[in-house]
Amino acid sequence: MSSFTHFNDQGRAKMVDISDKKITVRTAIACSSILVTKEIFDKISHNEIGKGDVLAVAQIAGIMAAKRTSDIIPMCHPLLLKGVDVSFDWKQSEEQYRLLIEVKVKTEGSTGVEMEALTAASATALTVYDMCKAVDKGMIIGETYLLEKTGGKNGDYIRNS
């Protein structure tokens, strides 16, 4: 089992020792989405959701989630993040309204920020759901995935379309 970095010689979980890894600039971009009804789209667009400004609150939730990733993902190292940016874009087709979520995370350290970006994207989508569920519980959170990452000994990664 020693080929798995998160297991010790006894096959038990461990946090990987990163003290010998080189400190480099590391970035990650993760994406998610949430499919909503026209009613929810209109209410978000006109700031008519009873709980407040959905996108502003979801953006803050995403930033907070990135900062707290090591608290909820057991083997993630606590990181000093240099920046977190949560952005939104609407994609409309016929009667479908999809809120696209993109999260960019940056640090300078000895481990990557992929999990921070993915956690932030997930928390952002979950926050939109939470704030809008009184209007309609049928919203669908879409795929959450890593779009790209830079830095580290394994090099850069860019997701194929």
Curated annotation (Swiss-Prot):
SUPFAM superfamilies the record matches: Molybdenum cofactor biosynthesis protein C, MoaC
Pathway info: Cofactor biosynthesis; molybdopterin biosynthesis
Domain of life assignment: Bacteria
EC numbers: 4.6.1.17
Family named by the database record: Belongs to the MoaC family.
Catalytic residue list: D130
Protein name in UniProt: Cyclic pyranopterin monophosphate synthase
Keywords tagged on the record: Lyase, Molybdenum cofactor biosynthesis
GO molecular function: cyclic pyranopterin monophosphate synthase activity
Species of the source: Bacillus mycoides (strain KBAB4) (Bacillus weihenstephanensis)
An example Gene Ontology biological process: Mo-molybdopterin cofactor biosynthetic process
Alphabetized NCBIfam families for the sequence: moaC, PRK09364.1
Subunit record text: Homohexamer; trimer of dimers.
A Pfam family hit: MoaC
Catalytic activity: (8S)-3',8-cyclo-7,8-dihydroguanosine 5'-triphosphate = cyclic pyranopterin phosphate + diphosphate
Protein residues bound to substrate: M75, C76, H77, M115, E116
